[in-house]
Every structure is written in C-alpha cells, then in structure tokens.
Amino acid sequence: MHQSLTQQRSSDMSLPDSMGAFNRRKRNSIYVTVTLLIVSMLILTVGLAATTRTQNVTVGGYYPGVILGFGSFLGIIGSNLIENKRQMLVASIVFISFGVIAAFCCAIVDGVFAARHIDLKPLYANRCHYVPKTSQREAEEVITSSSKITPSTRALRNLTQAVKEVNCPQLSRGLCTPRIRGNTCFCCDLYNCGNRVEITGGYYEYIDVSSCQDIIHLYHLLWSATILNIVGLFLGIITAAVLGGFKDMNPTLPALNCSVENAHPTVSYYARPQVASYNTYYHSPPHLPPYSAYDFQHSGVFPSSPPSGLSDEQEPQSPSPSPSYMWSSSAPPRYSPPYYPPFEKPPPYSP
C-alpha cells in the first residue's frame, strides 16, 4: 500500500518536472540556434566584404555563413513545431554539420592566405604605389610608345584599362619597368622583375582598389573571417548536439494511477453537509429489533422451569420485572414491514 502511494506521488510530481524539462530544452535550443544565425550572418557579411575588396584576391570564406544560416533557420522553425519537429530538426542538424565542415576548411584557407600571401611591411613603410585610372588618350599614348606601331586590335581592347609603366629599382637585376593597370596598388619590394619563382613576399599588386589602404582592410577582414569561422565551427557543434537531444522530446502527459485511494482523506470544515435522498431511505434495510412485541406478550405462556437439581430454597430469587420494562397488555403490537431488496418480487399473499 505504501509503495503504491509512493508511485502515485512520484507520477504526480513527474508532470511539472517533465514539462519544465521540455520547456528548458526548447529555450536552450532556440538560444543556440539564434546565436548561430547571428554568427552565420556575420560570416556571410565579412566574407563577402573580403571577397569583393579586390579583383585578384577572392578567398573570403562566406560559404559557411550561407550553410550555417540556413541550418540555424531550420532549427528555429523546428524548435517551435510540435508535429513535424523531428523532421525539421534532423534537416537542421544535417545542414549545420555541412556548415561546420565548410567553416573548418575556410578558416584554414583564409588564415593561411592572410598569414603567408599578404605582406603589410611595404604598405606601412609607404613603399607601395597606387596607380589611378588614366584617360583613354593617355592609354593610347602609352601603348603606341611601347609598341612603336599603330595600335592593333589587342591594344584597342585594352584602351579602357589604364596602363602605366612603373620604375622599380632592383639592386641585383637593374631597373625594371613593369606595366600595370589603373586602380592598382603595386609594391616594387615584392616584385622581382617578372620572375614569379623568386617572389619574396606573395602578392605584389592588388587590382581594382580605391587606394592602398584597402589592402590593410582586406588583411583585417580575412583574419576576422577566420576567427568568425572558428567561432561558427564550435558553435555549430554545440548547436547540433543541443538539437539532437531535443528532437526526440515531446510534451506528453504521464499516465496517472487513479486506482489507489488516498490513505489520509482531507476533511473540509466548510463543505456543505450531504443530505440523503429519498431513494437512500427507501432502499436501505430497516433496522429491526432482535425481538418483537409478540414475544413479550406470549412470554408467560411458556414459563421457564427451574433447572433440575435445585430446590425451591436454592432457586435464586430473581427480582420481579418492573412494569416500565414490560410491554403493557393494552398496547398494540408494533408492526415491522418485511424488507424486500430492490428488483425482487415479493411472495404471494397467503391468508
């Protein structure tokens, strides 16, 4: 009995605990997916800014931002569903897993490129030159003087590009005159007279920039994208783990055991007293005395004889019954109606 009551109490207490655990898991899953969505938007923004900063450097890792953003969006929707929650969360976990792999790869690529292929020492020393875009007439003069013939078809296609010659003094090879286009930041310290095998410092020109300060911005954007991809990597792993634990939880109500009665019933002192209905008195069996009036009236017909072996002297003198305890002879006998259970036919009348 005590064990049954303990089980009932535990089942009663499991209802708020289960609902509280479900709401807590739901709140945590929404928090991590919203945080991952914000980080993925930052990865996408910074990656696109780094990719479109120059024309010849396109290594900004914005692909993980797209994949992680879509996966976190599915996770937010699935966390607020009841019927199709599992399917949406499984799809979210799959996209987040691919986004984690992409973030790992892009973090390595962006970090290695920013560390080994961009040298900011010539930029900080003001040894890089920015070549603005020239007019069409100046470009024709440069091409004509360099080729010493009339402009060809190939030269005419390049008229829209600003072409200039920059003198880069080199101690080992003499004077180099590379030709560069307009809107380009060119660093002579990183250029070895066209010998790409002996390049000492990575990229020496950055095309389609507004100034050489854009290279510094590109360097910072690449490192920012690398850090954000690392953050997205770990946050994606945590989000996938949280969603994986929440996808199988449902707000189901536990079964309550109502077969065991309460051992200590509560008594309400302000409750209205119950009044028995007419049917209760009608169907209840009448309370009859153990003897009827007929027994009292005819008790003198058969007088009790004294037991054998006792003389008149040894017979105990019983006190005479008081008239108050005896039925009077003039009183009518009490009538007790026979009791018949409900739905039972009474016996036939007999005179």
From Swiss-Prot:
Pfam family, one: FAM70
Ranges where the record places region Disordered: 302-331
Keyword Metal-binding: no
Membrane topology: Multi-pass membrane protein
Gene Ontology cellular component annotations, sorted alphabetically: membrane
Family: Belongs to the TMEM255 family.
Protein name in UniProt: Transmembrane protein 255A
Organism encoding this protein: Mus musculus (Mouse)
Phylogenetic placement of the source organism: Eukaryota, Metazoa, Chordata, Craniata, Vertebrata
